[in-house]
Amino acid sequence: GTGTLVLRSYSPTTICIDWKGGGVAVESYTVTNDLTVCEVTTHAGGECAIYAYEEKSPLYVFSTNGIKMKDVDLTNMKSLVLVNLTNSGLTDVKLPDSDDLAELILDKNLLTDIDLSRYASQLRMLSLNNNQLTSFDASNMQNLLSLAIANNQLESLKLANPDMYNLEA
C-alpha cells in the first residue's frame, strides 16, 4: 500500500527513514521550512526508524497517515513540535526526547496504554481517537488545551486541565 508523509524543518536538512527495519529500505528526504509531502510505499509490520545527519536535527514536523508500521522510533528527533502517526497500526511508539513536543496525534492505531508523563507540561494538543485505551489520566497535563480521545474503550478518564477548551471523549 501507500501512505502520506509530511515533513518540515527549521533549516534545510536530510532525513533518512528506514521503512522496514534492519537497514534494508532506507530512503532519504530533503526537508526545508516548506512542507514536504510525499506518497510513500508502505511495508506492513516494518520497524520504522528515523535518522538525521545532525545530532540535533532541525526537523519539527513529522506526520504520517496510512503508513502501516509495527513500531516507530522517534527518540533522536529532539526538535519535533508536531508528531502525527495516524492509521499506522501501532501498538507502541517511541516518542522524541524533546522539550518542544506540543502536538501529538496518534489516531486510528491499536494503543492499549501510553505513558505521556514526560510531556505533561508541554503538550497543548493531544489526539488519541480510535485506539483501544481503557483508561487515561490527563490530570497532570496542566497546559493541555485540546484532548480528543473518542472511540476507545474508556472506563476511566481523569481531567484537571484549567485551560482546556476542547474535549472529544
Which residues fall in each region the model found?
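Short intrinsically disordered, low-complexity coil segments enriched in acidic
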Residues: 1-5, 142, 150, 166-169
